């Protein structure tokens, strides 16, 4: 895949958008350290970015199916490129201006996700999409390590304002680098309202029982397992182990495991791809399970490495099956439904977990999270067509 020029351009574009996305919170964190932004202001800016993302995802799914996927990527990237310097302009002056600009950046981020997913299906032949998706998700995992590291290194020689403008340049690359896909569908005079068009994508998703089951399992794991990582892991690292090194080590182990999983899925095609993917998703249950008892930190690291490995064993076949099975003209809308539910539930889970821990205690909540992570994929595996993530199995 890395020898094909069109895919290289697509891969570089997605990588640039990933770097810009992951770098922004760390750059704003540096602004808090140098007192040009308060902690409360940081929370507001990041919250508005998330809101912009969630609003844009379903809208962009409709637009990417209605018009050109490449055009949606272009305008999404340009939105991020233009809004990022505005965040820099508001730094130390106006949190309101920063928040409005961050909402536009978040909208650009949300708009490009389903469009990139659909554009991949246009650029890459069907029999090569699994290694292509593996290469893209590998880039995502590398950026989670590279973005904070690069930010810290660049901060030695560049100020926060310059770094924020730099994320705009990354968004510009994301806008300009990807290749053209298929020609946009011919416009029709009887276009349905956007909400009705999005509903058509929902109906397409309902035609695929494996998709609904897998999405429900993914949502359950994100709501419980991801929330345990976001809330419980930092506190347990501090209170039980007396050091933030356990938090850093667990997150690093997760990323390393995910990298291994992406490399593995570039070549491995199990016969029962759906079941293998759901087993991988269930591995996330070991993350909250490792936090239940005062085990050695190495056990926590191993559990998070397994979770990272498993999430890519799920992600790569999941994206590939969606691109293969969903009707092409509805792919962006179905992908936007996927991203809306999976990303949208993450902050909801975080909001619920802390009160649940206060009410019931650490151990019952973590045990419940682990149980859900194990049982939800197992239940999804029982649904007809889940074995290979294909409706053909039902015939």
Residue ranges and their predicted role:
Residues 1-395:
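Alpha-helical transmembrane-bundle signature of multi-pass membrane transport and export proteins
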């Amino acid at each position: 895949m890395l020898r094909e020029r069109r895919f290289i351009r697509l891969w570089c574009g997605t990588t640039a958008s990933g770097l810009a996305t992951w770098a922004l919170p760390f750059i704003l964190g540096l602004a808090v350290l140098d007192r040009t932004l308060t902690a409360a202001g940081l929370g507001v800016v990041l919250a508005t970015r998330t809101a912009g993302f969630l609003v844009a995802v379903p809208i962009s799914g409709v637009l990417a199916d209605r018009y050109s996927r490449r055009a949606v990527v272009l305008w999404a990237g340009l939105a991020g490129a233009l809004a990022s310097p505005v965040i820099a302009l508001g730094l130390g002056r106006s949190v309101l201006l920063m928040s409005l600009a961050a909402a536009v950046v978040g909208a650009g981020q949300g708009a490009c996700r389903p469009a990139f997913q659909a554009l991949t299906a246009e650029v890459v032949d069907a029999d090569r999409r699994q290694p292509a998706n593996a290469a893209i998700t590998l880039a995502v995992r590398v950026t989670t390590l590279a973005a904070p590291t690069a930010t810290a290194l660049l901060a030695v020689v560049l100020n926060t304002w310059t770094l924020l403008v730099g994320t705009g340049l990354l968004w510009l690359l994301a806008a300009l680098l990807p290749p053209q896909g298929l020609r946009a569908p011919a416009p029709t005079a009887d276009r349905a309202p956007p909400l009705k068009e999005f509903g058509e994508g929902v109906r397409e998703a309902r035609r695929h029982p494996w998709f609904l089951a897998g999405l429900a399992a993914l949502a359950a794991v994100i709501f419980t397992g991801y929330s345990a990582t976001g809330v419980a892991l930092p506190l347990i690292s501090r209170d039980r182990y007396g050091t933030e090194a356990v938090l850093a080590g667990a997150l690093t182990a997760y990323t390393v495991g995910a990298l291994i999983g992406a490399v593995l899925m570039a070549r491995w095609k199990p016969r029962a791809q759906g079941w293998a993917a759901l087993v991988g998703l269930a591995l996330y249950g070991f993350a909250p399970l490792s936090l239940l008892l005062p085990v050695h930190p190495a056990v926590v690291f191993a559990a998070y490495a397994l979770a990272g490995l498993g999430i890519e064993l799920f992600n790569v076949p999941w994206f590939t099956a969606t691109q293969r099975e969903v009707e092409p003209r509805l792919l962006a809308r179905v992908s936007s439904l996927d991203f809306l539910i999976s990303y949208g539930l993450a902050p909801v889970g975080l909001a619920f977990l802390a009160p649940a821990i206060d009410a019931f205690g650490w151990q019952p909540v973590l045990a419940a999270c682990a149980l859900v992570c194990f049982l939800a994929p197992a239940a999804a595996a029982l649904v007809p067509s889940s074995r290979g993530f294909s409706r053909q199995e039902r015939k």
